[in-house]
């Protein structure tokens, strides 16, 4: 049968060039998947960097934004970190994404590499579950000017330096003062990010369909400062009141050396990420598999 998707972007996990050769496993995986897609009647276009580092020269290439403009499906081969970076770029184009897991846990890259042909064949023919995930937009305001802006799919984290003491942060939600908190830092996470850093800080796991965020302090001085679930319709403002070497992280994007008085404004982005999963996929099955629930049980 002919694929529902005509132009498919193939993006792989890659590293910066080094003296060593590119990973043979990564190269072989991309080549096998590209050949499979071509046999399904798809026009395959590789991300420029993926093709370069994997040594694949038989396919046309585009940068990530070019893929978003040209392709009607993105196939990401790697781990969740690879998917985080790609999804932030492609969300604005509405490009649906399928993740083939070549990492470890793989919460959003959920197709096993060894089973990709059997799993992808019906998906390419239109048999899939669609899953929308919200993005955060974060801006750093200094002296009334925006000095940094980024999107995040997992979380925004403000934290202290590795050798410094606690930071003091002033928190507002929807323009209303919440509290001044002294802690090692603060996490604002999406439902997608609720199973990442926020979970280790004691936050709850949130179903991805819930329009909410979790705000979780990291090692707070006052133990009554607990994680709280917020509506994602409200902007969260985090102001740096005191502390040395304070930094902010937006997924894997970092801004070091925040200054006293800097304000980090976190709001829901205009675009969401579109994930496609195999037919029958559900969130709770993912939790059982990735977190080891029911091991040894019925």
UniProtKB/Swiss-Prot annotation:
Query: What does it do?
Result: Involved in the regulation of the intracellular balance of NAD and NADP, and is a key enzyme in the biosynthesis of NADP. Catalyzes specifically the phosphorylation on 2'-hydroxyl of the adenosine moiety of NAD to yield NADP.
Residue ranges annotated as coiled coil are: none
- EC number, as in UniProt: 2.7.1.23
Q: Name one GO cellular component term.
A: cytoplasm
Query: What positions does UniProt annotate as the active site of this protein?
Result: 80
Q: Which Pfam families match?
A: NAD_kinase, NAD_kinase_C
Q: Which InterPro entries match?
A: ATP-NAD_kinase_N, ATP-NAD_kinase_PpnK-typ_C, NAD/diacylglycerol_kinase_sf, NADK
Binding residues annotated for NAD(+), in chain numbering: 80-81, 154-155, 182, 184, 195-200, 219, 253
State its cofactor: a divalent metal cation
**GO:BP terms for this protein?**
NAD metabolic process; NADP biosynthetic process
Q: Where in the cell is it found?
A: Cytoplasm
Which source organism does the UniProt entry give? Delftia acidovorans (strain DSM 14801 / SPH-1)
Q: Please, which domain of life does this record's source organism belong to? A: Bacteria
- Keyword NADP belongs to the record: yes
Q: What is this protein called?
A: NAD kinase
Does the keyword field hold Transferase? yes
